[in-house]
């Protein structure tokens, strides 16, 4: 029997960064979560059987949990960073970080000293756990002694559980160097192991980047595949140099035994590896390393495609094995809009979630080392992950055909991923129940702008707010037959009004397209469809919208459309 499906990228449009996913064997579905920064509710849970259609089933963080996580007191682009979703000892577990907390604001908002002490002892790192993906979620369990961001939680085949994350290098060789460390953790108490064994008593540094002057090795994930434990990290920073690297360690009897074997081998070779700090280990020697890199790294990037490529910043990946569709990864990417200047790229939608098929390959020249130190050639060697084999980049459409005797995957790239001709219609006053707020500021409810161009009707009462952050936003409102507007670009602002000259029943709207915000009105009653509205409408006002881009405003988020009553 033959079945064909088509997966379209991005799978989650608009601001859905830092995706992490699992195959939920109990319910035969994929479960995926993304970062939400200062938005509440936060950590949305999406499910899908085959990646063609995603259903939003719940939010992990409600207003009450947001307060316990101190989200009301974070700065712009602070809050919930880079969740990792896993099943650990039968529980659904999310490891995550709260970043950019404003202590003064927290104290003024009623936080106790003990709350802040627990937060800082964990550097904002925490665990949430649940028996059902729909919740309720228990926590936060602040991870005392954690250090850095982007935590991963990994259960090995022997039952040992490892907490792994990235921190600034203690003794950096260059600016921007980070190091990935791991330590075993007790999943019942969520406290670090302290037994004197490798990765037990103190942190163990296992990676600092793939090459010379590598920066921002982060978003680590550990996976067991056959006799190996693989480490994947994003490197280069979440911008135009973003990439994904793969490393591995031979660990047929568990990661703990592999670490013990590394220590013995280092001792036999006379390898003297200086401690990073007292009580910590380092498995990055001059002669040998615990984890060996794929010589074909990076396994995923778009940085080699140049600035003519509209899909940039690709990385921060997470692997998944689907029982029918095989290996896949999910990652973030940014769809850029071309500016007026040479080489100018501008992002308004934020970082979105993309998927790609993954195959496992060996070096066919078996007389060479396979990029993994010692030449293991046994049948238990899975090889290395290859993303979108034969394409070398993300696809915008992936056709998957399953037959009785196998599976065929065909990734395709269109001429451009930069946008659609038909404008999306976002009516912020339609009473949607899926809106979010920023921190605990409930005067405006928002939704993600998921596509450009987008047409947004101006409410007849209340205001339309287009937000990048608290210092870069635009407000439009009706006052009689006039449209009033305010544009805030950091310390600069611009305000005014234009006569709408509308027929009764026709609502002016704002078109967000081609780096501009345009107020459009027609003589028609009602909005009709967005394409007709734009085609037949009169432009009353058109302003440069680049101040709403991430490149101008800074930070890590995308634009949202909001309703202010």
Language model features with spans:
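Carbohydrate-active catalytic/glycan-binding domains of CAZyme proteins
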Residues: 1-565
């Amino acid at each position: 029997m033959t079945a064909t499906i088509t997966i379209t990228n991005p799978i989650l449009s608009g601001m859905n960064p830092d995706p992490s996913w699992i195959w939920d064997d109990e319910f035969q579905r994929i479960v995926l979560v993304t970062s939400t920064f200062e938005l509440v509710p936060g950590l949305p849970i999406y499910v899908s059987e085959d990646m063609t259609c995603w259903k939003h089933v719940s939010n992990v963080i409600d207003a009450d949990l947001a307060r316990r996580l101190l989200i009301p007191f974070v700065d712009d682009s602070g809050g919930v960073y880079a969740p990792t979703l896993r099943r650990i000892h039968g529980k659904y577990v999310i490891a995550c970080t709260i970043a950019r907390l404003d202590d003064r604001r927290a104290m003024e908002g009623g936080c106790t000293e003990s709350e802040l002490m627990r937060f800082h002892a964990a550097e904002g790192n925490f665990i949430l756990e649940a028996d059902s993906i729909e919740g309720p979620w228990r926590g936060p369990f602040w991870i005392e002694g954690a250090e850095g961001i982007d935590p991963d939680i990994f259960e090995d085949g022997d039952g040992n559980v490892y907490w792994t994350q990235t921190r600034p290098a203690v003794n950096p060789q260059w600016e921007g160097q980070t190091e990935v460390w791991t330590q075993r953790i007790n999943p019942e108490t969520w406290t670090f192991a302290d037994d004197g064994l490798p990765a037990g008593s103190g942190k163990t540094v296992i990676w600092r980047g793939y090459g010379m002057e590598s920066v921002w090795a982060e978003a680590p994930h550990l996976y067991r595949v056959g006799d190996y434990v693989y480490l994947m990290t994003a490197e280069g920073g979440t911008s135009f140099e973003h990439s994904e690297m793969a490393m591995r360690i031979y660990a047929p009897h568990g990661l703990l035994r592999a670490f013990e074997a590394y220590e013995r081998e280092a001792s036999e070779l006379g390898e003297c590896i200086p401690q990073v700090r007292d009580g910590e280990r380092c498995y990055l020697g001059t002669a040998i390393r615990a984890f060996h890199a794929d010589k074909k790294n990076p396994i995923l990037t778009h940085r080699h495609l140049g600035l003519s490529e509209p899909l940039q910043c690709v990385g921060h990946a997470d692997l998944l094995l689907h029982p029918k569709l095989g290996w896949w990864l999910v990652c973030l990417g940014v769809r850029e809009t071309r500016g007026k200047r040479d080489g100018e790229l501008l992002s308004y939608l934020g970082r979105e979630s993309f998927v790609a098929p993954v195959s496992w390959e060996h070096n066919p020249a078996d007389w060479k080392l396979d990029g993994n130190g010692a030449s293991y050639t046994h049948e238990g060697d899975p090889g290395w992950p290859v993303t979108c084999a034969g394409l070398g980049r993300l696809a915008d459409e992936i056709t998957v055909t399953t037959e009785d005797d196998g599976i065929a995957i065909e990734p395709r790239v269109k001429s451009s991923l930069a946008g659609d001709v038909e404008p999306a219609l976002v009516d912020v006053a339609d009473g949607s129940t899926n809106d979010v707020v920023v921190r605990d500021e409930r005067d405006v409810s928002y939704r993600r702008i998921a596509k450009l161009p987008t047409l947004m009707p101006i409410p007849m009462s209340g205001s339309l707010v287009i937000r990048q952050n608290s210092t870069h936003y635009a407000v439009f409102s009706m006052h009689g037959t006039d449209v009033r507007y305010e544009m805030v670009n950091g310390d600069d602002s611009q305000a005014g009004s234009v006569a709408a000259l509308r027929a009764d029943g026709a609502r002016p709207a704002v078109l967000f397209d081609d780096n501009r915000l345009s107020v459009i009105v027609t003589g028609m009653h009602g909005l009709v469809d967005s394409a007709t509205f734009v085609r037949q409408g009169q432009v009353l006002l058109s302003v440069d919208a680049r101040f709403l881009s991430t490149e101008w405003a800074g930070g890590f988020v995308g634009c949202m459309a909001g309703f202010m009553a």
